[in-house]
Amino acid sequence: MPRFVRSFAALPVITASMLFASLMTGNAIAAGPAPSPVTPALVSAAVKEGTVTFYTSIDLQVAQDLATAFQNKYPGITVQVERSGAERIYQRITQEYDSKIHNVDVVDSSDAANLVDYKKNGWLAAYVPAEVGKWPVRQRDPDGFFASDRATLSVLGYNTKLIQPADAPKSYADLLDPKWKDKIVKAHPSYSGNIMTATYELSKAPGLGWPYLQKLGQQQIMQVQSSTEPPKKLALGERPVMFDGNEYNALMLIDTQAPIAIVYPAEGTPLVSGAAGVMKDGPHPNAARLFINYLFSVEGQQLLVTTGELRSFNPGITEPASRVPLSKIKVFTADPAEQEKAVDEIKQKYSEYFGT
């Protein structure tokens, strides 16, 4: 069964190889604290605290696998995983902090703009894990408050039992064909950070933008919440086409022989960089710093790549041979600070155009 469909048009979109070349050029070093290695003193202090609370929008099973691996490496520390959609996590943390409740130690979000807001509010601690010193400058906060702990792609896809490769959509434009009406499943930007970022990128994309999304909204879309859901609906045959499922969920399902093929659309594919940071007022500051060091380590990042099918900015990880290299995919990208300014507009226009 086809695993990938790659369709590339000669449009002014950034390829991943161009993106990373631009990220890595120059010798600029981000300001803020120097990278902090794991020391025996940090491990001892973390074990005394005994627990770390991790709010994340990573797929639950992957987050639990990460927690288990950390607990095996550092016996005596329990990771409490609180998993939800990125926008729900943002709402929860905002409500908790407004009520002077400080439960969370480490936060991860597929919507990096959330971390920009936490930083503005003074909720994050300036802390740079050891491996983050090797990160591309544009994938870490210049003041050391957060960095990109993972990336994924918001991809098109189709059910290979319901659609033949020759008939499958190859581009976003293809999905406006009347034959796809009532046949597309799509996630929601008000719930999912991945979809918030992808929607922002598409709204700025040449030849697409809000006029395209307005037309898509007339295709009787099956609307779901999380970006983890479209690949699952696709695998079950509830809809033959998905508009914006997570690449990593689709790959995980393909690994189980689910009838899914991924499409990297001709116009470009939204690249969604997540981010993670330590909360300044978290109840377990040492365990938080030890955990986030593990999250960004080669071991932690390799787990996300191998088990979770995510993309990583750690130069020490090994990409699965079966996966299309990021350097071969045209991508759209987002500036988290600019995206953060557009959140309300995205929610308003999406609700207007899609009726949800």
PLM segments and residue spans:
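A ligand-binding cleft/hinge motif common to bilobed small-molecule-binding domains
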Residues: A113-D117, P240-P259, G308
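Extracytoplasmic "Venus flytrap"
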Residues: G32-P40, V47-D65, G274
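Periplasmic-binding protein-like
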Residues: A151-T152, W180-Y191, L213-G217, Q223-V224, T256-G282, Y294-T318
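C-terminal capping/gating helix-and-loop segments adjacent to ligand/active sites or protein-protein/ligand interfaces
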Residues: Q301-T356
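Short, low-complexity disordered leader/linker segments with a strong preference
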Residues: M1-E49, T356
